[in-house]
């Protein structure tokens, strides 16, 4: 099966965890988009749910396929958050934010009773870091913030480039107006330590390390079979 078909397989399995009346966190990215489309079909057939989307694009897609959406201001507590990931490491540690929605994705995950990840087997890794870590930063003081990130990384034994994400000739902006640094550090063996260190840097708004948020992952294998990974207590 190709990558797109595997995304659909994982998304379809995730629907089995959705119950009538649930308040859903709805993620962003190509795999989450497949889930949204399938969820729209279920809603058309009588399923009653309401969702909080993690990006403008996801919210627009929900509306297009008939999935009711609201905000965390209206529903501050969610039953289940379903989202994709760029990397799935040991014990459900994640790198997310390749699409730029990391801040909203983490807020929604934290507001949910459970976070369920959907992905294909290529996203499962032994050590995080092959995928560049997105770091959302304030536009003010970019060079100072980058220098602080690089200094912190060096102190933790991490090496690699920290580059400003671009959108054509201009810096990429998130839905909330932040810029993103992509940190190519190779291997991240202590994600919790790195997470804490990043949050100590003024100018860092959020980062794509998700530690302790996801409880399980639905993994579509190359042959179309499903594997469920769960966080250890």
From Swiss-Prot:
Per the UniProt entry, the Enzyme Commission number(s) are 5.3.1.6
Which GO annotations describe the biological process of this protein?
D-ribose metabolic process; pentose-phosphate shunt, non-oxidative branch
Active site, per annotation: 105 (proton acceptor)
Q: Name one Pfam family in it.
A: Rib_5-P_isom_A
Keywords, sorted A to Z: Isomerase
**GO annotations of cellular component type:** cytosol
Which enzyme class, named as a word? isomerase
Where, by residue number, does the polypeptide cross the bilayer? none
> Catalysed reaction per UniProt?
aldehydo-D-ribose 5-phosphate = D-ribulose 5-phosphate
Q: Give the residues the record marks as binding substrate.
A: 28-31, 83-86, 96-99, 123
Q: Which InterPro entries match?
A: NagB/RpiA_transferase-like, Ribose5P_isomerase_typA_subgr, Ribose5P_isomerase_type_A
Q: How does it assemble?
A: Homodimer.
What this protein is reported to do is described as:
Catalyzes the reversible conversion of ribose-5-phosphate to ribulose 5-phosphate.
This one is known as: Ribose-5-phosphate isomerase A
Protein encoded by which gene: rpiA
């Amino acid at each position: 099966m190709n990558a797109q078909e595997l995304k659909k397989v994982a998304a379809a399995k995730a629907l089995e965890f959705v119950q009538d009346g649930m308040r859903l966190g709805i993620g962003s990215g190509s795999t989450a988009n497949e889930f949204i489309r399938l969820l729209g079909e279920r809603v058309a057939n009588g399923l009653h749910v309401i969702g909080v989307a993690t990006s403008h694009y996801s919210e627009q897609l929900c509306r297009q396929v008939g999935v009711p959406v609201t905000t965390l201001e209206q529903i501050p507590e969610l039953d289940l958050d379903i989202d994709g990931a760029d990397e799935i490491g040991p014990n459900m540690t994640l790198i997310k934010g390749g699409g730029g929605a990391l801040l909203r994705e983490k807020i929604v995950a934290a507001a949910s009773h459970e976070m369920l990840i959907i992905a294909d087997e290529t996203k499962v890794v032994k050590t995080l870091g092959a995928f560049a870590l997105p770091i959302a930063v304030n536009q003010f003081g970019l060079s100072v913030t980058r220098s602080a990130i690089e200094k912190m990384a060096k102190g933790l034994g991490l090496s690699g480039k920290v580059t400003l994400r671009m959108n054509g000739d201009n810096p990429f902006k998130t839905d909330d107006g932040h810029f993103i640094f992509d940190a190519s550090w190779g291997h991240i063996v202590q994600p919790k330590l790195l997470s804490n260190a990043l949050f100590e840097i003024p100018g860092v708004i959020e980062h794509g390390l998700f530690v302790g948020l996801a409880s399980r992952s639905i993994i579509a294998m190359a042959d179309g079979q499903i594997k469920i990974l769960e966080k250890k207590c």
